[in-house]
Amino acid sequence: MAEHTEETNLLQPTSRFQLLKDILGLYPAIDGEKHKSTLGTAGWLRAGVLGANDAIVSVAASNSQGQVLIAALAALFAGALSMAVGEYVSVASQKDMEDADLEKERWELENNPEGELEELSLLYQERGVDPVTATEVARQLMAKDALQAHAIEELGIRDFSQARPFAAGMVSFAMFITFGCIPLLVGAWIPYRWYAIGAITGVSLILLAISGAVGAFFGGANMLLGAFRVTYGGALAMAITIGVGFLSETLNISDMSYRDE
């Protein structure tokens, strides 16, 4: 009977704050295991994987040799710059929206602190916390860092200063150039067309698998599934791109030229 009572007590929260932690899922590590969130790596990881995959697919599908090699090299740098600028604009836009939300929240905290306290308390109550406990916890969190408390619970912004547009753009550019050079060099050193196509395709599929596995590893996901997903998607994109290229060659689109005035 004593053992049953002790076990029951262990399952009960020791304080109202502990109750809130249980409801929010803030459990301690089990058996000394340290849990590390992978959310902080999402920005640069996405930029790197996108840059690498786009480079592999774009360059591998170019089937470059001779003069086409020069065009592929130009396309490599054009694609890298395009990826870098696109990633920069995307992350910068996200950061601007987050900054605007934080500035609005900062103004509300300065001009209506009691209203913000009630708002935070209601958020906890909606998740199952009783009003007294919710108000107590909201008050304690706001006393420590009111802006952070509201940013996390109300705006869903957990990583302050994590959005780095310039860094994301540079990572995307570097990964595009690095991974794009590999199939480009393979195509440059093999003079026979079909051998080159086979070699470029094989190397590109391997690179796609590596890219997917590495991305899954840093993201804490299944590496095999990540490798398969990226390889399958990249192979499909390459097949479509090469198919369009062969269709263009069949229709002699490359022989078309602008007329002189």
Curated annotation (Swiss-Prot):
Residue stretches spanning the membrane: 66-86, 170-190, 197-217, 233-253
Binding-site list for Fe cation 3: E108, E116, E119
Molecular function as annotated in GO: manganese ion transmembrane transporter activity; metal ion binding
Binding-site residues for Fe cation 2, renumbered to this chain: E105, E116, E119
Domain of life according to the entry: Eukaryota
UniProt gene name: VIT
Keywords on record: Ion transport, Iron, Iron transport, Membrane, Metal-binding, Transmembrane, Transmembrane helix, Transport, Vacuole
Keyword Transport part of the UniProt annotation: yes
Described purpose of this protein according to its UniProt entry: Vacuolar iron transporter involved in the transfer of iron ions from the cytosol to the vacuole for intracellular iron storage.
Protein name: Vacuolar iron transporter
Residue sites binding Fe cation 1 per the record: E105, E108, E116, E119, E154
